[in-house]
Design a protein with these regions (language model features):
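Conserved helicase RecA-like core
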Residues: 2-270
Length: 270
């Protein structure tokens, strides 16, 4: 199967092609038709599986097919809720890349930064909004964002969102949207609290599970170190200098700590 077989319009296919994509991933193949059919979806998919495109492409397709030029950007019709600013920014960039030929307007709002520039963007009109829970509710409380016309609500990284204590915020956001909306919930894991949330807010959801049978590829050795937070940098330096050889890929939770680690490694000439 190729993207052209998923009933996506020529504008979206052109953008996908320019990014060099031809064959959809498993989560995309399973999720896109369901979302195009306006089904609620609960998907178990880890980062790196292509899940952002799995919900971005059908949202863009659906809004493009129904768009009225006279109402462009006048109402927020799709909302993606993400737990962190870094993820929210990445998602908005993906929407802009995939929707560059659709004329649909996107915006991202998140906390930890000035609210006025975000308000200005919202006032200019938005079709698709990507937001972190706290900032979204702040904007709604000040009557600066209207969720009354949402057609599709996406909850991304739901397990992380609940781990960060956003359960009440997520439920409130869901209630602020129309009852008739489509909901798609994506989560890397499916603990009881995520399943319980899905049972509460989703309507007869279709299930998508692309969790690998074996989480670690063959030939990969796993080692776990229990280390205090204050000793993480020290351990990292020790491993880089004495244990790990060849090319190295390091993951950290946020952009801030990645930048901090990168500066430290440069200082140590590693």
């Amino acid at each position: 199967m190729q993207f052209k077989d998923l009933q996506l319009n020529k504008h979206i296919l052109r953008a996908i092609s320019e990014k060099g994509y031809e064959i959809p991933t498993q989560v995309q193949m399973q999720t896109i038709p369901l979302m195009l059919a306006k089904k609620d979806v609960i998907a178990s998919a880890q980062t790196g599986t292509g899940k952002t495109a799995a919900f971005a492409l059908p949202i863009l397709q659906g809004l493009f097919d129904k768009q009225d030029p006279s109402k462009k950007g006048k109402k927020i019709r799709a909302l993606v809720v993400s737990p962190t600013r870094e993820l929210a920014i990445q998602i908005e960039e993906s929407f802009r890349d995939y929707g560059k030929y659709t004329n649909l307007k996107t915006a991202v709002v998140f906390g930890g930064t000035a609210i006025d520039p975000q308000v200005k963007i919202l006032k200019n009109g938005v079709d698709i909004l990507i937001a972190t829970p706290g900032r979204l509710l702040d904007l709604h409380k000040q009557e600066l964002v209207n969720l009354s016309f949402i057609e599709t609500l996406v909850l991304d990284e739901a397990d992380l969102m609940l781990d960060m204590g956003f359960i009440d915020d997520v439920k409130k956001i869901e209630r602020l949207c129309p009852k008739s909306k489509q909901i798609a919930l994506f989560s890397a894991t499916m603990p009881h609290k995520v399943v319980a949330l899905a049972q509460t807010i989703l309507n007869k959801p279709e299930k998508v599970d692309v969790t690998p049978l074996y989480a670690t590829a063959q030939g990969v050795n796993q080692v776990l170190y229990y280390v205090p937070k204050t000793k993480k940098m020290e351990l990292c330096l020790h491993l880089l200098r004495n244990t790990i050889k060849g090319d190295i890929l390091i993951f950290r939770r946020t952009k801030f700590v990645v930048d901090k680690l990168e500066k430290m490694l440069r200082k140590k000439r590693l």
